[in-house]
Amino acid sequence: IEQRIYDGMEGRTFYRPKTISPINCTNVLIEGITMERSTLWNVVPIYCENVIIRGITVNSTKVPSGDGIDIESCKNVLIEYCTLNCGDDCFTLKAGRAEDGLRVGKPTENVVIRYSLAQHGHGGITCGSETAGVIKNLYVHDCVFDGTRTGIRFKTRRNRGGGSDNTYYERLRMINVGKAFTWDLLGSAYYMGELAARYPARKVNRLTPDVKNILIKDFIVESADQFFTANGIPEIPFNQVVVENGEIKCKKLIGALNDAAGFTMRKLTIEAQHNDIHILDGKDILFEDIHFKLPAGEIMVNVEGERSGNIVFKNINANQEKVEYKKESPMRIEIK
C-alpha cells in the first residue's frame, strides 16, 4: 500500500485522478458519453458487478497512462459499440496486484467486449499486468484494431500472481499494428530486476502466474510488424493455446514461442517478409494446414531447449523447411 501513495507530499508524485470510477457498485450503466484529454485512466469500474459500458468515445492520445476502459476485479461486464483512441492501453482488464490482490481475492470474470474500435494505443485489448485474482471467462468478438502498438496483449510478471483462464478472441480485424498477438510473463530488467531473467526457474508459489486455455479464431491481420510472440516462464509454461482460421500479412512471423505446452496453429494463410520461427522449450506444438507466402518459399525454424519436443508441421505448403537446433536440443521435430 505504501508504494501506492501519490499525494505530492515529501517529494512523492501527485496521483492524477481517474475520470469515472465506480467502486463496489452493482448494476452500472455508462453510455453515450465522450471523454477528451483526461488526466489518467478514463472509465475504471473497480469491484463492481453487472456493468454495461456502451457507445462511449475516448480521445486521450497525448495523456501518459491515458487508458480508455480499465476493468478491475469486476464480474459480469459487457462493453460494446465503443471507440477508443488512447495514450496507453485501450481496453484493459486487471484483477489486483501481488499480495494485495490475493488478499482481496476478486477475479475479473465473465467479460464480453464486442463491436468496438481501438485506434491509437499501446494495446487494443490488454490483460494485466495486475492478475492476482485471475482474469477468466473473457470473450472478445467483432472488434477492429487500427494503428495500435499491439492488437491482443497479455502481460503479467512472476510476482503478480493469478494469471488467466478461458480467454477467447474471434472475428477480429487488425490494421497497421505493431505486434498482432503478444503474451509476456517476464517483463524487463529495468522494472523487474533479476525476475526478468528466464532462468533459473523459480520455485512455484502463490505469486506464480498460470496462463492457460486461450482460443484465437476467425481473424484478419491486414498489416503487422510481427504476427505472434509469447514469452512464458519455465516453472509454469503457457498451456492449451489454439490459433486458427486466420489471414495474416506481416513482416515477421513468430519472434518467440518460449515455454509453451499444448500450442496449436492451424488453418492459417500467412504472408510474411521474414521466415523465422523461434521455439524455446516448446512441447506438443502443432502447425497444421498453413499456407505460407514466404521469401524463397521456405521456413526457418530455430529450436532450442532441453524440454522442446513433439513439434509437428503438417500439411504446409512451403517448398522446403530448414530446421536449426542448438546443441542442447534433441531433434524432436516432424514435418509431414
Give, region by region, the residue ranges found by the protein language model.
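Extracellular/periplasmic carbohydrate-active domains that bind, remodel
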Residues: I1-K336
